[in-house]
């Protein structure tokens, strides 16, 4: 018999590395990047394909809008095919690393929002783990 673990518990355990957290850094684009765990593998370039676990939520309410953790399946994607916030942030990480991102609307979904889930001009938070960089 398979036991199901509530997604909130999995997410809490998954990102329970705050004790290792570095101070947040704000980049010129407005990205607020906080390393929670330093990775030891390769860092991706914008042209690489990466495998990531993530949880996206609104900073004001904490309401989750998407989570690969809740689905139990990391995602693979070319780094130059996602929102600019992710392209910038994941290049600051190494495989095995975890980080918290705050993405202002200008480098997230902007004035268009996304598919009725993310309103226009929304600032977004993401907890991300860079699992691997394909081919590195």
Where are these predicted regions, by residue range?
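Cross-family detector of peptidyl-prolyl cis-trans isomerase
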Residues: 2-136
């Amino acid at each position: 018999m398979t036991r199901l673990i509530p997604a909130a518990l999995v997410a809490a355990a998954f990102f329970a590395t705050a004790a290792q957290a570095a101070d947040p850094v704000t980049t010129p684009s407005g990205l607020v990047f906080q390393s929670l765990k330093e990775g030891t593998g390769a860092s991706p370039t914008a042209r690489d394909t990466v495998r990531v676990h993530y949880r996206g939520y609104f900073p004001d309410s904490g309401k989750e809008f998407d989570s690969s953790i809740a689905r139990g399946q990391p995602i693979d994607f070319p780094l130059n095919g996602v929102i600019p916030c992710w392209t910038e942030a994941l290049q600051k990480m190494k495989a095995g690393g975890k980080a918290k991102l705050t993405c202002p609307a200008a480098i997230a979904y902007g004035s268009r929002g996304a598919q009725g889930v993310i309103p226009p001009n929304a600032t977004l938070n993401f907890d991300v783990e860079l699992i691997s960089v394909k081919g590195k």
